[in-house]
A protein has these predicted regions:
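Histidine-acidic residue clusters that define the catalytic metal-binding segment
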Residues: 79-89, 228-269, 279, 301-306, ...
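His/Glu-based metal-binding/catalytic segments typifying zinc-dependent metallopeptidases
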Residues: 101, 229, 298-358, 362
Length: 516
């Protein structure tokens, strides 16, 4: 099957916009297609970007094109599928995964390091994300901007992401750029431009992100930041991953160097390369560029287990920017690779995925006590399969001001109870499993997304088998397993609730910024 970004359908859809290839709109759409991830947050960000930056005529065309592309992805056959994939470990500990995709003369690279929010030192909240930014500040050999010129000059794209259990750096470009990209990735694995100026610049950027995405946004990501802080008891799982300003301001160059030396080692990294390549040729190139990087001790994995939760946890917050109340509900989930993990993923999708989901139908359509429902396992910062420590099934519900929290919870509990007592219908189960599988296969058809998935799997499990096995294993999940999972995990004593309500405006004045 052709990858989505190079399929005739996708190319025709892009061409239909008739935008100059040098235009910003064209680049945004192409970047979105190349980096397509099946997550609600990516969709929301894309929609916001086109709403802000483009006139109505262009917005409509892009929206039609993007919607059609989603249909193309969802229509990919849900059948067992495995791409040719090989793996090798260098003498310095770097693990390399290569997967072939000859549908277009392009490649995707993902370098994932085994460091994320969860492992940040105490007193240095937000440091993993801050360091991700510093990785784009250049090195003595390749100053800031070189990476962008090499990749974007050929029509490619690059980015970085920090999550609970990994930080990844991704690039996609024409195959002619493979050697320069490998050289640059090796160069920044060897050293960085450690300067107070770079630290100050990126600290300011991260703090501005916090202001824009948290302090000055309705709800302030409370379902992603505040909820884990209430649901978990230990620092690795409960602290604010975006970072407290006092911790960010306290970061020193010595902290940056120590963090880099400890976590950005070859033995703590997995590089996956997917595209128009031959494994042995890629292994030789990686050995050429990365083989001389000295090995360093790999940091031990700390224990991040949580003590059992024995009672429901409930709290309330006020929000100066929200106009209607919001409710966040989190249930603790089974560990990664647990026998219950697949049933957890399916249950999360049955409850939250789309307007046919159990919660949308019960709360929005039938009882009319909610305006919107979203959520899932490991939501919103990951997939149900990519975590290496405690995580939650999250429900984020926005509800009308004339409805009470108890009314929302009564309808919510009724929907969950019905699933726990009766399980899903076979028709509902077949529908959601088919959608999950087609989404996963469609995702794997895009080289950069496959590279990302492969690198995460090897980082967590030591092999890439789960990338190709999970879609097939999903088809074996039964209604009885979903019913048993809901009865075991979706219980009141295993959940945490935060109710966030609009704050009253100050008397005689306008509301100030800051959503918390």
């Amino acid at each position: 099957m052709a990858s989505l970004d190079s399929s005739p359908t996708a190319l025709k859809l892009i061409a239909a916009l008739r935008l100059p290839v040098t235009s910003h709109a064209h680049r945004v759409l192409r970047r979105y297609i190349l980096g397509f991830r099946n997550t609600a947050l990516k969709t929301i960000c894309f929609q916001l970007e086109i709403q802000v930056n483009y006139p109505r005529s262009v917005r409509g065309a892009i929206a039609i094109c993007a919607g059609a592309l989603f249909l193309v992805a969802a229509a990919l056959p849900a059948q067992q599928w495995k791409a040719p994939t090989s793996m090798k470990k260098l003498s310095n500990g770097l693990t390399v995964v290569v997967s072939e995709d000859h549908s277009a003369p392009t490649f995707g690279v993902c370098v994932s390091y085994g460091i994320g929010f969860r492992l940040e030192p105490e007193g240095r909240t937000g440091f993993a994300h801050l360091f991700e930014h510093l990785m784009f500040e250049g090195t003595p050999n390749a100053p800031k901007g070189v990476l962008d010129r090499v990749i974007e000059g050929g029509g490619g794209a690059n980015n970085g992401d920090t999550r609970y259990d990994y930080t990844e750096y991704i690039e996609t470009a024409p195959i002619s750029a493979l050697d320069p990209v490998l050289w640059i990735e090796a160069d920044r694995m060897k050293t960085l431009d450690f300067s107070p100026k770079n630290l100050d610049n990126q600290r300011n950027v991260v703090e501005e992100e916090v202001r824009v995405n948290v302090l000055n946004q309705p709800y302030g990501l409370f379902f992603a930041i505040d909820l884990p802080g209430k649901a978990f008891d230990t620092y690795p799982n409960a602290h604010n991953f975006y970072g407290d300003f006092k911790d960010l301001d306290a970061a020193k160059i010595e902290d940056v160097k120590a963090f880099y030396e400890k976590y950005y080692t070859p033995g703590n990294a997995v590089m996956a390369i997917v595209g128009d390549v031959k494994p042995e040729e890629v292994f030789a190139k990686v050995e050429k560029y990365f083989g001389q990087i000295p090995s360093r001790s790999t940091p031990p994995k700390p224990k991040v287990d949580e003590p059992p939760q024995k009672a429901e946890r409930r709290s309330s917050e006020t929000d100066k920017l929200a106009r209607v109340p919001g409710l966040a509900i989190g249930y603790r989930m089974p560990p990664h690779k647990s026998p219950d993990a697949l049933a957890a993923a399916v249950t999360g999708e049955l409850l939250h995925n789309g307007q046919a989901s159990r919660l949308y139908q019960a709360l929005v359509k039938d009882k009319q006590v909610a305006l919107s429902v979203d959520g899932g396992v490991n939501w919103p910062l990951g997939t149900p399969f990519e975590y290496a420590g405690p995580t939650l099934m999250v429900s984020f519900i926005v509800y009308p001001p004339n409805v009470t929290e108890d009314q929302v919870l009564a309808a919510y509990d009724g929907a969950v109870k019905e699933l726990a007592e009766n399980g899903p219908t076979q028709q509902d189960l077949d529908r959601i499993v088919a959608k999950m599988r087609s989404d996963m296969y469609g995702n794997l058809e895009i080289p950069i997304n496959r590279a990302s998935a492969l690198s995460h799997a090897v980082l967590f499990d030591g092999n890439f088998d789960s990338v190709y096995q999970i879609p097939e294993e999903l088809s074996k999940v039964t209604a009885a397993q979903v019913k048993a999972f809901a009865a075991k995990y979706l219980v009141i004593t295993n959940r945490t609730i935060i109710n966030r309500t609009p704050a009253a405006a100050p008397a005689g004045g306008k509301e100030k910024g800051a959503g918390q």
